Design a protein with these regions (language model features):
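Charge-rich, low-complexity N-terminal segments
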Residues: 1-138
C-alpha cells in the first residue's frame, strides 16, 4: 500500500550548503534503494518534507528521521494512502522556501508549517515547484 507522508522539522544547527548536499546525496541513495520518492523544502530555519512509497518503508524512514539528532521539533502533518505518486520523478528533490520570497509573501504571508494544514503546505510546495527550479538529486 502506497502512502504519502508530510512532516516539518527544524535543524539542530544552522542549515549549511554542505549539510544540504549531504542530505540530498544520502536521501537519494537510500530512497532509490527503498523505492521512496519525495521532495524536501528548505528555508526559514526549517525543513518541510514529503515522502512517498510503501507504508513500511516510509514509516521506517520517518522513524529514523524522528530519532536523527540533526532534527528537532519533528511534527507529522499528514499521512495518507495514495493510488499514485505526486513526486514520482524524484527520489529526492529540493526547493527553497523563503519568507522573503515575494511569491510566498503575497500568496501565504502568514505561512507557518507548524500551524498550516497539509492542504496549505502542499499548495506552497506546488507553487515553489512551478515557480522555482527544483534541485534534483535522483
Amino acid at each position: 500500500m502506497l502512502v504519502r507522508l508530510l512532516y516539518v522539522s527544524q535543524p539542530v544547527g544552522p542549515i549549511t550548503t554542505t549539510m544540504t548536499t549531504l542530505i540530498l546525496e544520502k536521501s537519494a541513495a537510500y530512497n532509490k534503494k527503498e523505492n521512496i520518492t519525495g521532495i524536501l523544502c528548505q528555508g526559514s530555519g526549517l525543513w518541510l518534507q514529503v515522502l512517498e512509497g510503501e507504508r513500511s518503508h516510509v514509516n521506517l524512514l520517518y522513524a529514523r528521521i524522528m530519532s536523527d539528532r540533526n532534527h528537532r521539533n519533528v511534527e507529522l502533518l499528514s499521512i495518507e494512502e495514495i493510488t499514485h505518486r505526486r513526486f514520482c520523478q524524484w527520489s529526492m528533490a529540493l526547493v527553497y522556501l523563503s519568507k522573503d520570497d515575494p511569491m510566498v509573501q503575497m500568496a501565504h504571508p502568514e505561512f507557518d508549517p507548524y500551524k498550516a494544514s497539509a492542504k496549505d503546505a502542499f499548495l506552497i510546495l506546488d507553487e515553489l515547484i512551478k515557480t522555482g527550479s527544483p534541485i534534483l538529486n535522483t
